[in-house]
Amino acid sequence: MAKNLKITLHHGIVNRTPAQRATVKTLGLNKIGKTVVREDTPANRGLVNAVRHLVTVEEVD
């Protein structure tokens, strides 16, 4: 069974770099408190790592 990542945006993107804003948008997050579930792939891990100070991540099945 494939693992998934539950990603929640906990900090806003105001006053963040354009790259960080684009990364948050790519993950499908647009409001504080919004949660998305994404497949656990190296690409998604890299996106999360780039904005790790703005999001929380949980592994789910």
From Swiss-Prot:
First and last residue of the signal peptide: none
Record-annotated disulphide pairs: none
Keywords in alphabetical order: Ribonucleoprotein, Ribosomal protein
Entry GO terms, CC: cytosolic large ribosomal subunit
One of the protein's GO biological processes: translation
Pfam families tied to this protein: Ribosomal_L30
GO molecular function, a single term: structural constituent of ribosome
Subunit record text: Part of the 50S ribosomal subunit.
UniProt family annotation: Belongs to the universal ribosomal protein uL30 family.
Name of the protein in question: Large ribosomal subunit protein uL30
